[in-house]
């Protein structure tokens, strides 16, 4: 029996479990078992899979979206996955969404699955992909990309209120209404209705009167069916009377609605943003063509010889902290999958110390650790003595230790992501042209296309590709120094205001370390001298190292003579840009009175440039944020559930700066 754990500060707890003598998992919190001890799989199949008319319900659909309230052990998911893989169309896609307020850990999941031996391969895949108990959305890709599992960790009603999806079938499987009333509230039923379409089916084990009344009030037609075993009845239903619901996203940020599904997509840029997007879209079944002006992927800002992949924790629960937590755990999962076949994406050595930059920063980082409530295998505090011992150099202060973070080889990573993507290198796109049937892409000599959609992932030069969109990112030059490795035995990365990577082997076989980096605004994109390294920039980062960590800095005789410079795409509010590109003139007309506080219900829907999308403004955090944005773009184009909470979608939306300006009274 595991000890009961208190909810963490993000509002999510973990499952408190006891195990009966027959190995049935039991929840003391809800005084109930997770499944029937002798016939759990049979009962779940009867109540839930047969309740939504599986497999017939998905056999004529290229995409099927199923959602569950109460993931629990994941037994319903495993049974659904097993049946879907055996009966779905050859090119079908399954999207499975599940809410869970008290997730189990990996060991408990595996133990709960042990009685169902025929599900062992699916169980192993689920356990391996299982995220830590951190609040928010966690999307995982299974079955070679044919199945996405989107886990919503947190209270059911509030998590579903953040969801953007169209659900075809529901499993209502929380603990009994008398033991877990929050899972069966009118607020939750309203979210079920909002997320459903005409004809959406539902199935549940309970026929409680409050549940039936709540669902009928939301437009569902219900009927009782014979229960399983000693249970007399179970519940089945169909949404036959959809009700109008207030959107969970303001109209000026509402996702675009396409009349026809996207089949082909062109992606401009083979840095980490474009590569991650291409990978995710390819796995979603889209026809992907990538264009890159250089001869190989990862040639500009994503071409550094070693790049740090590390989380960003914030002192308090915030949009910033929640977004970067979601991005970190998504990227960690993707990189683990890639490393199974291409271990070279990681440089040797794992683990990163984010050292406090001052005594005040000690308190800030400790508060960030407390509010994140991350498990220690992902974040823990090291005092100065421990940090100094582990990193092999005297450090004035402790910091946050991230055991799973580390140094990546960005160009190898980009190449791995693009391994099966059709790509045109040394092909500089200079103009995008909308056509009645899509988009054509033009170089100075020829054109390509048409494509249903275009994703601009061109970094700092993105605004030049379609000026009408008024993409608001700015360019910032960054320069890093490449030094001979001072301590080859130190295998950990260090962030101290600047950063120092662990040693890696360069193309000549020499052990080197990267010391970074500078930030310099670059206003003139026609001035290509940004790629030239400046001695004063080398001096600046070396001086910062020596002032902060003099004993470490003294291991080098002076500033580096080698390095690398590139342009980053940055944003004034330090948040990235993601999503459909807007028609700015239509926004200025339609939302001219936003500053008057007009009600949301009276506002016109967003006007987008049809089929044109952006991943940009990633700054120096591309390795952290690009994988999540790739998955989001794949969902947006293919019609899957968006793995981003609604308020985070609004926070990264390309229209946000314009909308903020329109909300201010004119001078």
From Swiss-Prot:
Pfam (any one)? Methyltransf_30
Gene this protein is translated from: mnmC
Region feature Disordered, mapped onto this chain: 1-20
Under the heading InterPro entries, the entry gives: FAD-dep_OxRdtase, FAD/NAD-bd_sf, MnmC-like_methylTransf, SAM-dependent_MTases_sf, tRNA_MAMT_biosynth_bifunc_MnmC, tRNA_MNMC2, tRNA_S-uridine_synth_MnmC_C
**Catalytic reaction annotation:** 5-aminomethyl-2-thiouridine(34) in tRNA + S-adenosyl-L-methionine = 5-methylaminomethyl-2-thiouridine(34) in tRNA + S-adenosyl-L-homocysteine + H(+)
Q: List the disulfide bonds.
A: none
Per its UniProt record, what PANTHER family does this chain match?
A: SARCOSINE DEHYDROGENASE-RELATED (PTHR13847), TRNA 5-METHYLAMINOMETHYL-2-THIOURIDINE BIOSYNTHESIS BIFUNCTIONAL PROTEIN MNMC (PTHR13847:SF283)
Protein name, as recorded: tRNA 5-methylaminomethyl-2-thiouridine biosynthesis bifunctional protein MnmC
Q: Does the keyword Cell cycle apply?
A: no
User: An example of a Gene Ontology BP annotation on this entry?
Assistant: methylation
Instruction: Return the EC number.
Output: 2.1.1.61, 1.5.-.-
Upper lineage is: Bacteria, Pseudomonadati, Pseudomonadota, Alphaproteobacteria, Magnetococcales
Keywords, alphabetical: Cytoplasm, FAD, Flavoprotein, Methyltransferase, Multifunctional enzyme, Oxidoreductase, S-adenosyl-L-methionine, Transferase, tRNA processing
Lineage: superkingdom: Bacteria
Spans annotated as tRNA (mnm(5)s(2)U34)-methyltransferase: 1-240
- Tell me the NCBIfam families matching this sequence: MnmC_Cterm, PRK01747.1-2, tRNA_MNMC2
Q: Which family does it belong to?
A: In the N-terminal section; belongs to the methyltransferase superfamily. tRNA (mnm(5)s(2)U34)-methyltransferase family.
**Polar residues biased stretches:** 1-12
Check the record and name the SUPFAM superfamilies matching this protein: FAD/NAD(P)-binding domain (SSF51905)
Question: Which residues does the annotated region (FAD-dependent cmnm(5)s(2)U34 oxidoreductase) include?
Answer: 268-667
């Amino acid at each position: 029996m595991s000890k009961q754990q208190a909810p963490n500060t993000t509002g999510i707890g973990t499952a408190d479990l006891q195990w009966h003598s027959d190995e049935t998992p039991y929840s003391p919190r809800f005084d109930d078992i997770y499944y029937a001890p002798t016939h759990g799989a049979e009962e779940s199949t009867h109540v839930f899979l047969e309740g939504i008319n599986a497999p017939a319900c998905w056999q004529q659909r290229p995409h099927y979206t199923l959602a569950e309230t109460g993931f629990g052990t994941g037994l319903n998911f495993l049974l659904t996955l097993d049946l879907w893989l055996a009966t779905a169309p050859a090119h079908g896609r399954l999207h499975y969404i599940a809410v869970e307020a008290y997730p189990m850990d990996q060991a408990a999941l595996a133990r709960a699955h042990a009685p169902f031996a025929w599900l062992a391969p699916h169980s192993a895949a689920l356990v391996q992909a299982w995220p830590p108990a951190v609040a928010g959305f966690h999307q995982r890709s299974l079955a070679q990309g044919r199945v996405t599992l989107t886990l919503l960790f947190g209270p059911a009603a509030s998590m579903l209120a953040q969801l953007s999806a169209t659900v075809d079938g529901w499993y209502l499987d929380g603990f009994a209404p008398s033991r877990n009333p929050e899972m069966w509230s009118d607020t939750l039923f309203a979210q079920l209705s909002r997320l459903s379409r005409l004809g959406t089916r539902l199935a549940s084990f309970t026929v409680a009167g409050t549940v039936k009344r709540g669902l009928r009030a939301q437009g569902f037609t219900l009927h009782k069916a014979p229960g399983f075993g000693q249970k007399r009845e179970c519940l089945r239903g169909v949404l036959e009377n959809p009700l109008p619901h207030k959107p969970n996203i303001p109209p000026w940020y509402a996702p675009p609605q396409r009349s026809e599904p996207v089949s082909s997509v062109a992606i401009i840029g083979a840095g980490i943003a474009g590569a991650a997007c291409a990978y995710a879209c390819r796995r979603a079944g889209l026809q992907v063509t990538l264009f890159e002006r250089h001869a190989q992927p990862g040639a500009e800002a994503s071409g550094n010889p070693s790049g740090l992949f590390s989380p960003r924790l914030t002192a308090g629960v915030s949009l910033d902290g929640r977004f970067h937590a979601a991005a970190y755990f998504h990227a960690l999962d993707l990189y683990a999958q890639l490393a199974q076949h291409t271990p070279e994406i990681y440089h040797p050595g794992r683990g990163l110390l984010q050292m406090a930059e001052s005594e005040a920063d000690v308190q800030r980082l400790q508060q960030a650790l407390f509010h994140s409530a991350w498990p220690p295998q992902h974040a823990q505090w090291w005092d100065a003595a421990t940090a100094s011992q582990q990193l092999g150099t005297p450090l004035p202060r402790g910091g946050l230790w991230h055991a799973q973070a580390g140094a990546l080889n960005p160009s190898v990573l980009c190449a791995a992501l693009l391994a099966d993507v059709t790509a045109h290198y040394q092909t500089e796109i200079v103009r995008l042209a909308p056509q009645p049937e899509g988009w054509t892409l033009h170089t100075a000599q020829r054109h390509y296309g048409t494509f249903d959609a275009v994703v601009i992932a061109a970094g700092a030069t993105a605004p030049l590709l379609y000026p009408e969109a008024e993409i608001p990112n700015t360019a910032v030059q960054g320069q890093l120094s490449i030094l001979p490795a001072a301590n080859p035995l130190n295998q950990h990365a260090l962030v101290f205001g600047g950063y120092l990577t662990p040693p890696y082997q360069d193309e000549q076989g020499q052990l080197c370390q990267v010391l970074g980096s500078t930030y310099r605004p670059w206003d003139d994109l026609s001035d290509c001298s940004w790629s030239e390294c400046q001695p004063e920039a080398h001096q600046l980062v070396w001086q910062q190292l020596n002032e902060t960590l003099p004993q470490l800095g003294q291991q080098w005789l002076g500033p580096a003579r080698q390095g690398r410079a590139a342009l980053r795409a940055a944003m004034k509010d330090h948040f990235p840009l993601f999503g459909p590109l807007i028609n700015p003139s239509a926004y200025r007309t339609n939302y001219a009175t936003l500053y008057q506080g007009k009600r949301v219900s009276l506002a016109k829907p967003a006007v987008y440039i049809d089929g044109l999308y952006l991943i940009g403004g990633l700054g120096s955090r591309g390795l952290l944020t690009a994988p999540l944005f790739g998955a989001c773009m794949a969902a947006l184009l293919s019609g899957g559930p968006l793995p981003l909470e609604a308020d985070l979608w609004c926070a990264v939306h390309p229209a946000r700066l314009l909308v903020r300006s329109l909300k201010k009274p004119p001078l």
